[in-house]
From Swiss-Prot:
FAD binds at residues 100, 102-104, 106, 110, 168, 173, 179, 183, 234, 490, 525, 528. Catalyzes the oxidation of cytokinins, a family of N(6)-substituted adenine derivatives that are plant hormones, where the substituent is an isopentenyl group. Monomer. It is an enzyme of class 1 (oxidoreductase). It catalyses: N(6)-dimethylallyladenine + A + H2O = 3-methyl-2-butenal + adenine + AH2. Glycans are attached at residues 52, 63, 133, 321, 432. This is Cytokinin dehydrogenase 1. Its EC number is 1.5.99.12. Residues 65-244 form the FAD-binding PCMH-type domain. The gene is CKX1. GO terms for molecular function: cytokinin dehydrogenase activity; FAD binding; oxidoreductase activity.
């Protein structure tokens, strides 16, 4: 125990030195705590304060905010994380804070820890026992919290199965998305990723490792799923799987009228009287603002629109005097032995009742893996063009279905029409509230409406215009507030306690009680700015 306190003293001293002298570097923690002993994270080199470790951990995908940690832990196993948290909890006085970094894909510093410790979760993925395992009966997959969803997919496909619910981008960690919710086009029928978790291993703010599920330690299970890293870190998740299809017919349908677009989207996600759903396994949508950037936006949409197709859509918008056009994106999955004619017939039948513009249906046939990992190719192209590592002032909202037309008029046909250039996709699609578990920490719009929309305005500041884009986001939120649109922010970041209280609404008191129970010293995930 004496060695642990030497570790704490060294860390606090390092943090104070950084605060006093700036971010010019750090002193190796092992030098401050020279006594070697089994499990000493500092002496083993796993806990580092050098700039090569701390500077990369001070930034995230958003490229908007930065916060230098005092140290970074590179754990070899969950036991190293537990040791760090036990040491932090046992520290006298005001302990250091701890955050958990997967791919660093937060946009507003949610995974940063100014003057604290950032845990580099992906360090647990190297060596040792496999951290992704499909059950013998093919019912579930166990995955380490540090594992990427794309690797979970590949391991599961090798056994002929796959998780049911995804995010659009698979190069994120299991623990990262489950700490938020994890939404995509499958959410309408299977719920978010958190609704598909069977069991977790969690290390709490006490440094205690707990296995939890709906049957055992259910309060912690519900707290952690969608809990923004406030109650513990997920080191293992058991996720339900289903038989994996071989291929997908990937369809895009173009609309010039928002009412027809949203009505068809809601028709596609509506459950039948027996609770089942239609043949579409994935339903999303996109908005393309008319104007000089319309053709470029269309041609960057997954290869669906050729130059000639884009020109036709531009002409359609002009003929209808439309300020925006809309596209439903959907997939129909099928087996390897399905014939092209049978797939064509199934798609034709599924499209029969829809009201898209005649002649404006586009499709591709792809492997199931190619579809799910579709965004990665776009990332590679943007990376090569130097447009990936730019500021990303994203705005993600859950909007009640009854108010989505008001949002369209006020935002897509209003505020965004004054923007000089829009770089980044504008995504919009409905999901069913009944597929979400109200006991979990994630929040959805209040009220009894079954349908709400996921709206993701994924702006990229490619023209050094991040301040203007952030101001635009504030205008959008102010419009929603003044119009009484009862939205909830997804992947939220607020600067005041009052905003967080409003965000959680009826869940706030329970959220606070759970924080006091599982992280009473407020050690975990300080970058969320909820309790710190």
């Amino acid at each position: 125990m004496a060695a642990i306190y030497l570790l704490i003293a060294a860390l606090i001293a390092s943090s104070h030195a950084l605060a006093a002298h700036g971010a010019g570097g750090g002193v190796p923690l092992a030098a401050a705590a020279p006594l070697p002993f089994p499990g000493d994270l500092a002496a083993s080199g796993k806990l580092r304060t050098d700039p090569n470790a701390t500077v990369p951990a001070s930034m995230d995908f958003g490229n908007i905010t930065a916060a230098l940690p005092a140290a970074v832990l590179f754990p070899g196993s969950p036991g190293d994380v537990a040791e760090l948290l036990r040491a932090a909890y046992a520290a006298p006085g005001r302990p250091f804070t701890v955050s958990f970094r997967g791919r660093g894909h937060s946009t507003m510093g949610q995974a940063l820890a100014a003057g604290g410790v950032v845990v580099h979760m992906q360090s647990m993925g190297g060596g040792g026992a496999p951290r992704i395992n499909v059950s013998a009966d093919g019912a579930y997959v166990d995955a380490g919290g540090e594992q990427l969803w794309v690797d979970v997919l590949r391991a599961a496909l090798a056994r002929g199965v796959a998780p049911r619910s995804w995010t659009d981008y698979l190069h994120l960690t299991v623990g990262g998305t489950l700490s938020n919710a994890g939404v995509s086009g499958q959410t309408y029928r299977h719920g978010p990723q958190i609704s598909n978790v069977l069991e977790l291993d969690v290390i709490t703010g006490h440094g205690e490792t707990v296995t939890c599920s709906k049957a055992v330690n259910s309060d912690l299970f519900d707290a952690v799923l969608g809990g923004l890293g406030q109650f513990g870190v997920i080191t293992r998740a058991r996720v339900a799987v289903e038989p994996a299809p071989a291929r997908a017919r990937w369809v895009r349908l173009v609309y010039a009228d928002f009412a027809a677009f949203s009505a068809d989207q809601e028709r596609l996600v509506a459950a039948r009287p027996d609770g089942s759903h239609g043949p579409w396994s994935y339903v999303e949508g996109a908005v393309y603002l008319a104007g000089r950037g319309l053709a470029v936006a269309l041609k960057s949409s997954g290869g669906f629109f050729s130059d000639a197709d884009a020109a036709r859509v531009v002409a359609l918008a002009a003929a209808r005097n439309a300020t925006a056009v809309y596209s439903i994106e959907a997939t129909l999955n099928y087996a390897a032995n399905a014939t092209p004619s049978s797939v064509d017939a199934a798609v034709a039948a599924a499209l029969g009742d829809l009201h898209f513009e005649e002649g404006f249906s586009f499709s591709r046939d792809v492997t199931y893996e190619e579809f799910l990992d579709r965004v990665y190719g776009e990332e590679e192209a943007l990376e090569k063009a130097g447009l990936w590592r730019v500021p990303h002032p994203w705005l993600n909202l859950f909007v009640p279905g009854s108010r989505i037309a008001d949002f369209d008029r006020g935002v897509f046909k209003g505020i965004l029409q004054t923007a000089t250039d829009i770089a980044g996709p504008l995504i919009i699609y409905p999901v069913n509230k009944s597929k979400w578990d109200a006991a979990m920490s994630a929040v959805t719009p209040e009220g009894e409406e079954e349908v709400f929309y996921v709206v993701s305005l994924l702006f990229s500041a490619v023209a050094n215009d991040v301040a203007a884009l952030e101001a635009q986001n504030r205008r959008i939120l102010r419009f929603c507030d003044l119009a009484g649109i009862g939205y909830k922010a997804y992947l939220a970041h607020y600067d005041s306690r009052g905003d967080w209280v409003r965000h959680f609404g009826a869940k706030w008191d329970r959220f606070v009680q759970r924080k006091d129970k599982y992280d009473p010293k407020k050690l975990l995930s300080p970058g969320q700015d909820i309790f710190n």
